[in-house]
Amino acid sequence: MTELNFHLLPIISDRFTTTTTTSPSFSSHSSSSSSLLSFTKRRRKHQPLVSSIRMEQSRSRNRKDKVVVILGATGAGKSRLSVDLATRFPSEIINSDKIQVYEGLEITTNQITLQDRRGVPHHLLGVINPEHGELTAGEFRSAASNVVKEITSRQKVPIIAGGSNSFVHALLAQRFDPKFDPFSSGSCLISSDLRYECCFIWVDVSETVLYEYLLRRVDEMMDSGMFEELSRFYDPVKSGLETRFGIRKAIGVPEFDGYFKEYPPEKKMIKWDALRKAAYDKAVDDIKRNTWTLAKRQVKKIEMLKDAGWEIERVDATASFKAVMMKSSSEKKWRENWEEQVLEPSVKIVKRHLVQN
């Protein structure tokens, strides 16, 4: 697998530097021992103040940065909640979706649009050229850590949002070994010792409602130009490779490769016969099935993180998604449900997290 060249990442630059400040110290010289002793005696009555300052400096050095982490299955509303929170708290968002880090396929990967970002800065979103290799969990840990430092240096709160729980664990775990998959055998490999002071919010939706919503979302994505986007992306050489890397793992790419192999995009075929229609429908059905499989896998991993000791607070977005699915329901009703059952509880959780010492 090609290793990613981090010099190609726009988000990583020379401005990510760390300066270390050391306390002044006295050098020990025999000729000045008597004067040093005299100095120590003169300062003795102020020793409690000095000790207090040193203790505070030590606490400051050991204090962990606070971060907010939005978890949830694909389509559950993580991006919306992260932006909603970022407009209420001084925050910037770090993408933790391993597919959305790459340039291109904005519809297929369901990247949040510029309009929906509402001016909130987003990091590690659509910044990596897919031709430069695959971003590993270890590389994400390094890149995202630098972004956290930069955001906190601006006195803002990093909000981490995305569906790749392996990336989330890589960034947050105090002990991280890239050779092991922490989710491979229960929660025994998941680190409960975290590098940051984390506020975890899990946006959850009931299975039946989320399933119906994801089916409809795929249809809406196809209507929005996903098929045309995939036809432009199709590469007959790369699609034939046994192992897929990076953005070529995105749901939609492998599912339509078989279709485009049979009906190449460069050939203008106006007529859609029954065979071509069946091949198209099969690809769409495969996307729906694989999207649902991904959602269930993501929820299982979140439960594993919780079992490992991560203090994850759950907010239920089911009513909001039911309102979206109902044709008779107005947008106002959907927004009311979202704000009452998802946003307001999340704001309270974040406020409590930020005021904790």
Swiss-Prot record:
GO terms for biological process, alphabetical: cytokinin biosynthetic process; secondary growth
EC number: 2.5.1.112, 2.5.1.27
GO molecular function annotations of the record: AMP dimethylallyltransferase activity; ATP binding; ATP/ADP dimethylallyltransferase activity
UniProt enzyme class: transferase
Span list, region Disordered: 20-58
InterPro entries: Dimethylallyltransferase, P-loop_NTPase
Induction field: Down-regulated by cytokinins.
Binding site for ATP: G72, A73, T74, G75, A76, G77, K78, S79
Coiled-coil boundaries: none
Composition skew (Low complexity), residue ranges: 20-39
Reactions performed catalytically: dimethylallyl diphosphate + AMP = N(6)-(dimethylallyl)adenosine 5'-phosphate + diphosphate; dimethylallyl diphosphate + ADP = N(6)-(dimethylallyl)adenosine 5'-diphosphate + diphosphate; dimethylallyl diphosphate + ATP = N(6)-(dimethylallyl)adenosine 5'-triphosphate + diphosphate
Superkingdom: Eukaryota
Record-linked PANTHER family: ADENYLATE ISOPENTENYLTRANSFERASE 1, CHLOROPLASTIC (PTHR11088:SF75), TRNA DIMETHYLALLYLTRANSFERASE (PTHR11088)
Protein family: Belongs to the IPP transferase family.
UniProt-recorded name of the protein: Adenylate isopentenyltransferase 1, chloroplastic
Species this chain originates from: Arabidopsis thaliana (Mouse-ear cress)
Gene that this polypeptide is encoded by: IPT1
